[in-house]
Swiss-Prot record:
Enzyme class at the top of the EC tree: transferase
Pathway per the UniProt entry: Carbohydrate degradation; glycolysis; pyruvate from D-glyceraldehyde 3-phosphate: step 5/5
Reaction catalysed by this enzyme: pyruvate + ATP = phosphoenolpyruvate + ADP + H(+)
Protein name listed in UniProt: Pyruvate kinase I
Protein keywords: ATP-binding, Glycolysis, Kinase, Magnesium, Metal-binding, Nucleotide-binding, Potassium, Pyruvate, Transferase
Sequence positions that bind Mg(2+): D11
One GO molecular-function entry: pyruvate kinase activity
Organism: Photobacterium leiognathi
Binding site for substrate: G10, D11, T43
Length: 235
């Protein structure tokens, strides 16, 4: 199985009718969200910026729609590789991403659920629900292989996700997951040590401020790799 997919709309447009591409894109993004896999949407996102300093309104809407569909990342190609305005293209895409993220709602219904939730997903969904109800700005996750962090991300929390891991490869992979900030630590010896270090990292990274409510999810501390604990703390 792959770790994720890239929705390359240019290639899709060659293989399937052009009017089907948007539906294929939405279907693939939803399946990746459901399976907790990374999904990147790419090709011709701001294509007119190869020659022009501003995108068309349709292109801006295309980027925003991919984000609202649930993509983890959007990618430029010719715009930054050979275009006249690479810096402007990256800047405008980042602005569209930031603005759209503000309006994406948490996905706490059953659309992305399996018929029977795994323990990890059930706990992580509960953590997102708790964070929303408490207006917590941050969810801190202990994760070894990244599964717990991706399970939290699956439900589109408003809160940022701080993924604490001892695995540098996991941290690198989580850089592609939407809303996740990975931090590598030397060790996580116990649940109490995770709570203490996680809160310190929240303050050090600037993702949390003194007095903030945070939800902490312990995934890496269970031998089976299953997340089974979510708790509420104050920084």
């Amino acid at each position: 199985a792959s770790d994720g997919i890239m929705v390359a709309r240019g290639d899709l447009g060659v293989e399937i009718p052009v009017e089907e591409v948007i539906f294929a894109q939405k279907m693939m993004i939803e399946k990746c969200n459901r399976a907790r896999k990374v999904v990147i949407t790419a090709t011709q996102m701001l294509d007119s910026m190869i020659k022009n300093p501003r995108p068309t309104r349709a292109e801006a809407g295309d980027v925003a729609n991919a984000i609202m569909d649930g993509t983890d990342a959007v990618m430029l190609s010719g715009e930054s590789a050979k275009g006249k305005y690479p810096i402007e293209a990256v800047t405008i895409m980042a602005q569209i991403c930031a603005r759209t993220d503000d309006v994406v709602k948490p996905e706490l219904g059953s659309r992305l659920d399996s018929p029977r939730l795994r323990i990890t997903e059930a706990v992580c969904k509960g953590a997102v629900d708790t964070a929303e109800k408490l207006n917590a700005p941050l969810i801190i996750v202990a994760t070894e292989a990244g599964k717990s962090a991706r399970s939290v991300r699956k439900y589109f929390p408003t809160a940022r996700i701080l993924a604490v891991t001892t695995n540098t490869k996991t941290a690198a992979q989580l850089c592609l997951s939407k809303g996740v900030t990975p931090v590598v630590v030397d060790s996580i010896e116990s649940t109490d040590a995770f709570y203490l270090r996680g809160k310190e990292l929240a303050l050090e990274t600037g993702l949390g401020a003194k007095g903030d409510i945070v939800v902490m999810v312990s995934g890496a501390l269970v031998a089976s790799g299953t997340t089974n604990t979510a708790s509420v703390h104050v920084l």
